[in-house]
């Protein structure tokens, strides 16, 4: 069950599709997941609550800024795929949805606070240099932060080996700085 409240967005809809126009301003969202054992062949009893806020600001010729904050809490003992798994990006290409230079599926947590800051200059800096302007490169400044923890009961469910072969596993965020 989830909600999304964006008071400044507006929609255009016809018979076949609905298009959302995102304006500068706040967007509030949330999600609640509940696991009930023996319903749809489920084995786990848990509840997960996620609340977030996204703020967009347009700065005219200077660019646009997006700030996002999110709080996540999981109650119950579940295996790592049902916990919050953070997506890493090992390439040098920027991905707004992933944590860059972090390995794919490296960290999990059951309680976390995360934040993202992104500013897109929209050519404000690089369009002043003639040769770089032809490449149509854009400059972006950003930062991403996660603080989280993993309950010891959930940590024990992370497998360390498979058929006698040691495998690389998920790590908890509370093992020190990355």
Where are these regions (language model features)?
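Exposed, low-structure sequence patches enriched in small/polar residues
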Residues: 1-178
